[in-house]
Design a protein with these regions (language model features):
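N-terminal domain-start signal
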Residues: 1-93, 169, 175-183, 194-242
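Short, recurring structural edge motifs at helix starts
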Residues: 37-46, 129-139
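Transmembrane alpha-helical segments and their cytosolic interface motifs
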Residues: 49, 118, 137-143
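Hydrophobic/aromatic-lined pockets within catalytic cores
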Residues: 61-64, 153-157
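Extended, low-complexity, amphipathic alpha-helical coiled-coil/linker regions that act as scaffolds
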Residues: 67-69, 141-145, 157-187, 191
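Alpha-helical interaction scaffolds
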Residues: 88-117
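Intrinsic, low-complexity N-terminal interaction/targeting segments
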Residues: 116-132
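A structural feature that tracks compact, well-ordered secondary-structure segments
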Residues: 148-152
């Protein structure tokens, strides 16, 4: 019998793979995602699927916007996936593929697929996967899975998720079709949207601080240049007098 890896082992693997310091503003986002994925992947009822992968990449890409240095983001994502014994390239490819379905089919067709389980031709085996979720009483629901569903709905029909009444109707139908716990779905998506707003506000404040710091630095540099120019001019005048 295989021994399940512990959270400490997962974290240790992550920090072994990504050795650069984490930007303190984003540390909580990174570690919470790592812990969430760890707890899911060691659960006996958990099954990886492309919609879950889309949830993972959506959360990472959305909440890591503005991370500096930018070049570290790929290393962090790769380390998270590998720390939970996943393939980062597969996560990316599966997420991109399932999201591309929204471009290959109409918004109505995608919504009917997720909310009524009407087969979507371009979805291939995902049709059977959704039916399997519906029929599996032990399906391991997760916040990342519903964020993947929400991202598909938002991509296919942005006006629906932006309208409270339409969003409520669609999510209710989706939960009924897939046998998902509506109370958990509401709680997870409310928190997700709330965190998006907070992150956007924090990012805006950070951008203002960076912009103000840049202007102050440019002003100091200009003042220094002016001072240097004045000193140079004084030297020339002194030499001329001599």
């Amino acid at each position: 019998m295989d021994t399940l890896r512990t959270l400490s082992e997962t974290k240790r693997t992550f920090y072994t793979l990504h050795t650069r310091p984490l930007n303190s503003i984003y540390r909580r986002v990174i570690e919470e995602l790592l812990v969430e994925m760890h707890l899911l992947t060691v659960n006996v009822d958990f099954q990886y699927d492309p919609i879950y992968a889309l949830g993972v990449t959506t959360v990472f890409d959305t909440f890591m916007q503005g991370y500096q240095p930018e070049k570290d983001k790929e290393s962090i994502f790769n380390a998270i996936c590998k720390a939970v014994e996943g393939d980062p390239e597969k996560y990316r490819q599966d997420a991109q593929w399932v999201k591309s379905l929204c471009e290959q089919a109409s918004g109505e067709a995608v919504t009917a697929w997720l909310c009524e389980l009407k087969p979507l031709e371009v979805a291939g085996n995902l049709n059977q996967m959704l039916e399997g979720i519906r029929d599996n009483p032990r399906f391991k629901y997760s916040r990342l899975f519903i964020i993947g569903i929400y991202t598909l709905l938002e991509t296919a029909n942005p006006e629906i998720v932006n309208d409270d009444q339409q969003r409520e109707t669609v999510l209710t139908n989706c939960c009924q079709a897939l046998n998902l716990p509506k109370d958990k779905v509401d709680k997870d998506l409310d928190l997700y949207r709330s965190n998006l707003e907070k992150m956007e506000q924090a990012r805006s404040v950070l951008e203002d601080v960076v912009r103000a710091d840049r202007k102050q630095r440019e002003r100091r540099e200009q003042q220094q240049q002016n001072t240097d120019s004045e000193l140079e001019l004084e030297k020339k005048e002194e030499n001329t007098e001599v």
